[in-house]
Amino acid sequence: MAFSTIFILLICGICTNMVSAIFGIGGGVLMVPILRTLFPELPIQVISATSLTIVMCTALINLLFFHKQKIKIDYINMILWSIAMVIGVQIGFELSFYFSTAIISLIFTVSLSALAIKTFLNRSRIQIEVFNMSPIERAKGSISFCGGGLIAGITGIGGGSILAPLVGQLKGVKTQQIAVYTNYMMIIGGIGNLYGYLTRAFLYDASLSGQLGLNFLVVGVVTLGSFEMSFFSMKLRGLMNPVLTRKLLAIILFCIAAYMCILEFVFH
């Protein structure tokens, strides 16, 4: 692997950690387009598996810092929503092998564009203190996260960019809890999807070093960059204004969607 590629991947790790810690999205929205650009010879499924592994490693780093900050969540909700996400992820994973790269890229682009518009137009809601979430609200969350997992499984974006706006719409979830919920669900939901990718047979020449269903060398380099950035990201997270954070998230999602669309349908 060229030094320039390693440098780019380190920068990707830094950016991945920032968007994961500050916005609650896993970084898959960054990694999928970047990996498609750096390694165009790899199948989209291998890129998705590599992206998911990076997302899980970054989420684990963030959770260690969240634990030190003593941010509490409802673990019953987290488990129920994670199970729903896993179901959606597995369905999406199986469907991804029946879709062409163009269709997967189209789903990726449309999903991110819709989320960007919704996030940008969404007004700040009044924070309601709810200690016991109603069964209806929990069911609403489960259905939403199953759908989010479906899109994540098809596209390999990790689910955080989809889950973060959905978690924020649920009553009883505080703003500072959103990133904690999504990071937990990205790890749990990603495990099943990653297992499927690693045990699935691929018909391609794995010529890159560190390649086994996913590229472990890429994962290691990006995770290293993510770890180096983690402390600064948590400090920056505490300084960011919620309104500004939401607007920036919308802009990031839209720019990535536009880039992926141009990469696939203009230059491909």
Swiss-Prot record:
Claim: Aminoacyl-tRNA synthetase is one of the keywords in the record: no
Database matches in InterPro entries: TM_pro_TauE-like
TM stretches of this protein: 6-26, 46-66, 79-99, 101-121, 147-167, 178-198, 212-232, 248-268
Signal peptide: none
Entry keyword Membrane: yes
Disulfide bonds: none
Protein location: Cell membrane
Lipid bilayer topology: Multi-pass membrane protein
GO cellular component, one term: plasma membrane
Primary location class: membrane
Alphabetical UniProt keywords: Cell membrane, Membrane, Transmembrane, Transmembrane helix, Transport
Family assignment from sequence similarity: Belongs to the 4-toluene sulfonate uptake permease (TSUP) (TC 2.A.102) family.
Protein name: Probable membrane transporter protein HI_0806
